[in-house]
């Protein structure tokens, strides 16, 4: 084992996690071993989130926490990367003399120069300079048999509240063959679930980078079908869809392809026409109702996850009530609610009618309470059903209880299925009968091979402990709500 050690802290979204995994791969290729304890590390890397005020604060707190190890630990070099340094490079460099190097949101591969000892302090480049490729080094940090795959970078939208285009640049789609090569590598290592992510997944292929050599435009449906056909892949899941163009062929894949899970992650942000105009979303509430109705009608057993913003400038009591009515009507399985963050670089920063923080907090609580009742009803309806579950590992609370997820539960955000009644390994797919339910989590009993029909169509599970021991590490992940998880 290498005597040179590195520790990573990753903040924010799954897209940032992939960037952290690339830097982990760069570090490993440079001869560094990853350690869970920051006090043991010669180099510490903090991959930051700079999307909203709360995320910026958590990133800054994490940086200062890690800086303590330069005084009291083994740390000789502290590196700050990601969206926060992309957004505020000069300010951070001035206010944080403890930091030795700054990398931006597209500078992951530059970590190699830092580790080699011949890099300048400021390495923040153009956010549109980099797009991940299958050949880039990467060390997985996700649990069990699951991995995220970035299919594009950047965004061309102009939503009022969002600064992502400034942080990540314009949309750049990966060619289908390159994405497929990466998925093939992951499947060969035992990964069963492929989670396709980008800033604007529905827009995949519309930019020049996504076109084939012949000039034909790649489509998201074409990509999804190719990924789902990779041997060893059991689930393909889509994140960050936009309610603009859900093509028939994409809906058909969600409805009928045996390896494309009937799961839609589509942040709708609001439902009132006036609010959607202020947010510059490009559609009204009627469009959203049509999209939801179409997906419910055409995709059997659909799980619909969405997100809303409350407290955006100009939001009235009546518009908030319209949003609540919409949520009651739609009965989404999963909803994330965010209080508006007034970011100076956003278009909404200049809008009048700022909503008091107390009002926004009250609306947040009301909408979450409403959705919690809906989610509990949806979870209770799962009792008695038999589901396919991807086993991820042992429960944090009970070492003798396994946990996993069914197709309607995305990694980290949608709850777990807690398992009893048998022995299975992380990365294995098994059949489970649900016996209990809470608002978000389920409890189930493993069915034996004969009862579940296991083995009739499911490939044998890879031993992830053996196959990916050299590629998978524990990554300290700080989510933007302040929760910390140790992912194995």
Curated annotation (Swiss-Prot):
Catalytic function, reaction form: L-aspartate(89)-[ribosomal protein uS12]-hydrogen + (sulfur carrier)-SH + AH2 + 2 S-adenosyl-L-methionine = 3-methylsulfanyl-L-aspartate(89)-[ribosomal protein uS12]-hydrogen + (sulfur carrier)-H + 5'-deoxyadenosine + L-methionine + A + S-adenosyl-L-homocysteine + 2 H(+)
Cellular compartments per GO CC: cytosol
Keyword Ribosomal protein attached: no
Residue positions binding [4Fe-4S] cluster 2: 155, 159, 162
EC number(s) stated in the UniProt entry for this protein: 2.8.4.4
Record flagged with keyword Cytoplasm: yes
Note accompanying the cofactor annotation: Binds 2 [4Fe-4S] clusters. One cluster is coordinated with 3 cysteines and an exchangeable S-adenosyl-L-methionine.
Biological process per Gene Ontology, one example term: tRNA modification
TM region(s), chain numbering: none
Binding-site residues for [4Fe-4S] cluster 1, renumbered to this chain: 13, 49, 83
Cellular localization per UniProt: Cytoplasm
Domain Radical SAM core: 141-377
NCBIfam families: 30S ribosomal protein S12 methylthiotransferase RimO (TIGR01125), MiaB/RimO family radical SAM methylthiotransferase (TIGR00089)
Function: Catalyzes the methylthiolation of an aspartic acid residue of ribosomal protein uS12.
Protein name as it appears in the record: Ribosomal protein uS12 methylthiotransferase RimO
Source organism of this protein record: Sorangium cellulosum (strain So ce56)
């Amino acid at each position: 084992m290498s005597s040179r050690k590195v520790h990573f802290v990753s903040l924010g979204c799954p897209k940032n996690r992939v960037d952290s995994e690339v830097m982990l791969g760069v570090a490993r290729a440079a001869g560094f071993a990853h350690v869970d304890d920051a006090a043991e590390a010669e180099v510490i890397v903090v991959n930051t989130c700079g999307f909203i005020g709360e995320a910026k604060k958590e990133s800054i707190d994490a940086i200062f926490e890690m800086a303590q190890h330069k005084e009291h630990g083994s740390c000789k070099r502290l590196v700050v990367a990601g969206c926060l340094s992309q957004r505020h490079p000069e300010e951070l460099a001035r206010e944080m003399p403890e930091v030795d190097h700054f990398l931006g949101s597209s500078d992951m591969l530059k970590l190699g120069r830092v580790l080699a000892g011949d890099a300048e302090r400021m390495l923040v480049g153009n956010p549109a300079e980099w797009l991940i490729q299958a050949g880039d080094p990467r060390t997985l940090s996700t649990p069990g048999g699951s991995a995220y795959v970035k299919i594009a970078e950047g965004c061309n939208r102009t939503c009022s509240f969002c600064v992502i285009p400034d942080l990540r640049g314009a949309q750049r789609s990966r060619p289908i063959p390159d994405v497929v090569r990466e998925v093939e590598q992951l499947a060969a290592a035992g990964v069963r679930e492929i989670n396709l992510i980008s800033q604007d997944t529905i827009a995949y292929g519309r930019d020049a980078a996504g076109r084939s050599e012949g000039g034909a435009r790649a489509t998201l449906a074409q990509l999804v079908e190719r990924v789902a056909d990779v041997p060893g892949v059991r689930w393909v899941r889509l994140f960050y869809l936009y309610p603009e163009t859900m093509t028939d062929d994409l809906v058909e894949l969600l409805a009928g392809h045996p390896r494309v899970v009937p799961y839609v992650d589509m942040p709708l942000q609001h439902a009132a026409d006036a609010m959607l105009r202020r947010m510059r979303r490009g559609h009204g509430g009627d469009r959203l109702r049509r999209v939801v109705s179409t997906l419910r009608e055409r995709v059997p057993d659909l799980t619909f996850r969405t997100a809303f913003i409350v407290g955006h400038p100009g939001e009235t009591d009546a518009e908030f009530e319209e949003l609540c009515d919409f949520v009651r009507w739609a009965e989404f399985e999963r909803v994330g609610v965010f209080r508006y963050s007034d970011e100076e670089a956003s278009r909404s920063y200049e809008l009048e009618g700022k909503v008091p923080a107390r009002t926004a907090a009250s609306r947040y609580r009301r909408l979450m309470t409403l959705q919690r009742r809906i989610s509990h009803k949806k979870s209770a309806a799962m009792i008695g059903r038999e589901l396919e579950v991807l086993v991820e590992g042992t429960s944090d609370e009970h070492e003798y209880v396994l946990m996993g997820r069914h197709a309607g539960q995305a990694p980290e955000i949608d709850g777990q299925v807690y398992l009893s009644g048998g022995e299975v390994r992380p990365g294995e797919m098994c059949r489970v009968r649900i016996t209990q339910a809470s608002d978000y989590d389920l409890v189930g009993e493993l069915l034996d091979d004969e009862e579940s029909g296991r083995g009739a169509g499911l490939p044998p599970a890879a031993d992830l402990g053996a196959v990916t021991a050299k590629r998978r590490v524990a990554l300290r992940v700080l989510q933007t709500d302040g929760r910390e998880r140790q992912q194995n």
